[in-house]
Amino acid sequence: MDVRFRLCLFLVILVIVANANVIKEPEKRFHPNLWRPPRCDWPHGVCSYIRDRCAPDTPFPCGPIFACPLPTNKCCCRRPYLPPWAGRR
């Protein structure tokens, strides 16, 4: 009985220690140096070729805020956006 209890306690402690980094991840998610832009997709905007103008229904270029999967594309948004760390004015 004592061996089973110690083994169970050891496994519980092992799981807690192994998941310690997972618990800290949400703090890192919005750090400006580690932030990755989300995909430029509906409802935010559309990806178009870099040298083309943005369409009339998506007039705002928002490249640093949203990313397109291809490096030859840029993101055109329906309204202007600010990155999460820029703060609202």
From Swiss-Prot:
Residues 1-20 form the signal peptide. Residues 21-27 form a propeptide. GO terms for molecular function: toxin activity. Keywords: Cleavage on pair of basic residues, Disulfide bond, Nematocyst, Neurotoxin, Secreted, Signal, Toxin. Disulfide bonds: none annotated. Belongs to the Cnidaria small cysteine-rich protein (SCRiP) family. gamma subfamily. Contains 4 disulfide bonds. GO terms for cellular component: extracellular region; nematocyst. Induces neurotoxic symptoms on zebrafish. Has also been claimed to be implied in calcification, but tests on homolog proteins suggest that proteins of this family have a neurotoxic function and not a calcification function. Its main location: secreted. The sequence shown here is derived from an EMBL/GenBank/DDBJ third party annotation (TPA) entry. This is Small cysteine-rich protein 1. The keyword Secreted applies. The keyword Secreted applies. It is found in: Secreted; Nematocyst.
